[in-house]
Amino acid sequence: MIGRLRGIILEKQPPLVLLETGGVGYEVHMPMTCFYELPDAGKEAIIFTQFVVREDAQLLYGFNNKQERMLFRELIKTNGVGPKLALAILSGMSAHQFVNAVEREDPAALIKLPGIGKKTAERLIVEMKDRFKGLHGDLFTPAADLVLTSPNGPTSDDAEQEAVAALVALGYKPQEASRMVSKIAKPDANSETLIREALRAAL
């Protein structure tokens, strides 16, 4: 079981990061709320991981702290919620926001996320509410808004294409992802900024 990786970021392609440690490059799927906080390529990062085995693949999911990973583990225990949907949930809102939505019994907040219908939202609230008693604490307080800059980043067209691809990977349909990015596109914005703004506008 791979539970933690420390190494150098080789590539960042939302929602994937390639981390080199011990001469091995690990491809890690990360929620966008965690991806935003990663340092730039070429710098060191520590990622807490969850190893998931499927019939057709073995995947690593990564998080910035143990609490986020614990929430992911609880989510995939919920009936009808697999790793891909859990990743989409934690990309669309922070752990703190998700906990608050469940505790407020607010299915409307969850329905806005890709792949979440009314029944799934209600099931999440019922199944997750009791589990949160031992989960959330200081590390689930909202983080300060991050200012993302990329002075030497890709062109705006490249950034928009990367943002659309990331949203599709998170469960949005291609046409919907393209529309979401077009609505918030800015000439000098990098892909991470576009993804964050698109997800924020969808809530």
Swiss-Prot record:
Domain II: annotated span? 65-142
List the record's Gene Ontology CC terms alphabetically. Answer: cytoplasm; Holliday junction helicase complex; Holliday junction resolvase complex
Can you tell which superkingdom this protein's organism belongs to?
Bacteria
- Region named Domain III: 155-203
Gene Ontology terms: biological process: DNA recombination; DNA repair
For region Domain I, the annotated ranges are: 1-64
Q: Which portions of the sequence form the region Flexible linker?
A: 143-154
Sorted keywords for this record are: Cytoplasm, DNA damage, DNA recombination, DNA repair, DNA-binding
Q: What subcellular locations does the record give?
A: Cytoplasm
Q: Which GO terms describe its molecular function?
A: ATP binding; four-way junction DNA binding; four-way junction helicase activity
Assembly and oligomerization: Homotetramer. Forms an RuvA(8)-RuvB(12)-Holliday junction (HJ) complex. HJ DNA is sandwiched between 2 RuvA tetramers; dsDNA enters through RuvA and exits via RuvB. An RuvB hexamer assembles on each DNA strand where it exits the tetramer. Each RuvB hexamer is contacted by two RuvA subunits (via domain III) on 2 adjacent RuvB subunits; this complex drives branch migration. In the full resolvosome a probable DNA-RuvA(4)-RuvB(12)-RuvC(2) complex forms which resolves the HJ.
Q: What is known of its domains?
A: Has three domains with a flexible linker between the domains II and III and assumes an 'L' shape. Domain III is highly mobile and contacts RuvB.
Q: What does this protein do?
A: The RuvA-RuvB-RuvC complex processes Holliday junction (HJ) DNA during genetic recombination and DNA repair, while the RuvA-RuvB complex plays an important role in the rescue of blocked DNA replication forks via replication fork reversal (RFR). RuvA specifically binds to HJ cruciform DNA, conferring on it an open structure. The RuvB hexamer acts as an ATP-dependent pump, pulling dsDNA into and through the RuvAB complex. HJ branch migration allows RuvC to scan DNA until it finds its consensus sequence, where it cleaves and resolves the cruciform DNA.
Write out the similarity annotation: Belongs to the RuvA family.
Q: What is this protein called?
A: Holliday junction branch migration complex subunit RuvA
Species in which this protein is naturally found: Enterobacter sp. (strain 638)
Instruction: Provide the taxonomic classification.
Output: Bacteria, Pseudomonadati, Pseudomonadota, Gammaproteobacteria, Enterobacterales
From the UniProt record, report the name of the gene that encodes this protein: ruvA
